[in-house]
Amino acid sequence: MSITKDQIIEAVSAMSVMDVVELISAMEEKFGVSAAAAVAVAAGPVEAAEEKTEFDVILKAAGANKVAVIKAVRGATGLGLKEAKDLVESAPAALKEGISKDDAEALKKSLEEAGAEVEVK
């Protein structure tokens, strides 16, 4: 006579937490598997699906040093002086859209060093 799943579940539910931990360790050794690895593998694809690949850099405010921010905006966008000044003065405004995470973070860092308040979406 073999043991059913229900009988196993009943037996495990009657065990103390320490007994369950010992049971799991024994099963990992017996079958050469790790319970943590199975959880990580199951969670892996979900995280990959949620990861965003394109980011927008939004200038929230120019800050106290507007001239330095205008220079940073010109360098990042290739705009002329007047266009960059108008963009900075019209904050909040999108500086770049659909760029990689690394590029967005680098742009954010350079603008923040110039004194701007920046958001990456």
From Swiss-Prot:
InterPro entries, sorted: Ribosomal_bL12 (IPR000206), Ribosomal_bL12_C (IPR013823), Ribosomal_bL12_C/ClpS-like (IPR014719), Ribosomal_bL12_oligo (IPR008932), Ribosomal_bL12_oligo_N_sf (IPR036235)
UniProt keyword annotations, A-Z: Ribonucleoprotein, Ribosomal protein
One Pfam family cited in the UniProt record for this chain: Ribosomal_L12_N
Top-level taxon: Bacteria
One GO cellular component, as annotated: cytosolic large ribosomal subunit
An annotated Gene Ontology molecular function: structural constituent of ribosome
Gene Ontology biological-process annotations: translation
Complexes and interactors: Homodimer. Part of the ribosomal stalk of the 50S ribosomal subunit. Forms a multimeric L10(L12)X complex, where L10 forms an elongated spine to which 2 to 4 L12 dimers bind in a sequential fashion. Binds GTP-bound translation factors.
HAMAP family documented for this protein: Ribosomal_bL12
Recorded family membership: Belongs to the bacterial ribosomal protein bL12 family.
Protein's job: Forms part of the ribosomal stalk which helps the ribosome interact with GTP-bound translation factors. Is thus essential for accurate translation.
Name recorded for this polypeptide: Large ribosomal subunit protein bL12
Native source organism of the sequence: Klebsiella pneumoniae subsp. pneumoniae (strain ATCC 700721 / MGH 78578)
Lineage, broadest ranks: Bacteria, Pseudomonadati, Pseudomonadota, Gammaproteobacteria, Enterobacterales
Gene transcribed to yield this protein: rplL
